[in-house]
Amino acid sequence: MKVVYHGDQKKHYPGQFLVNGRFRPNPELPERMDRLLDGAKAAGCVPETPENHGMAPIGAIHSAVYLEFLEHANERWKRIDGAADAVTPNVHPDRREVGYPASVVAQAGYHMADAAAPVSDHSWTSICWSAWTAVHAAELILDGADSAYALCRPPGHHAFNDMAGGFCYLNNSAIAAQVLRRAHGRVAILDVDLHHGNGTQSIFYSRNDVFTVSIHADPLRFYPFFWGYSNERGEGAGQG
């Protein structure tokens, strides 16, 4: 089996994140990818470098205004006197339908579910290569491979159509599933993780062509807290 990854995924350095009211060192560091890659190689996986697949497969899942924010937020943030090193929200709207704000500070709150997905100098580069890694692995399957391992960093299952969170920015599995839809009528995403894949669920909640299953700890006590309950069964065409 091939393991797909790109070295530029290591450029993203989130620094710290807010947990239990305190800023702590972010565990989603570049070294995490090294350990996963070493494990994949030890298991016999053959490394393959992905191509730049452009913005079309990413834009098929994520909104244009959100992608614009992710790409340019850091350079806009740096113009603020006394701002932190990375884009980090400090206010969140209780009603997102009231309109789209102009300030990058307000946009950070609009597009970030929490303070665990900061955007720093090289984040956008790594974010894109992580998504292209998922696209490339999906293309390998479409070309006839039985399986492929997309080593995606940053991860993606907490990323919504227009919102980051939980170390995630672009929803890599959702992007890959959409690519696979070119040749398959229905696709399934099985998400096994301590935390519920709330972003993935949200993206396909009203669709019947991608089936999402998340096996996770009880959100009554575990992040993401507000999603992942047994009564969440989809809506409209996606209800089941």
Ranges and model annotations:
Residues 1-190, 195-240:
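HDAC/HDAC-like amidohydrolase catalytic core signature
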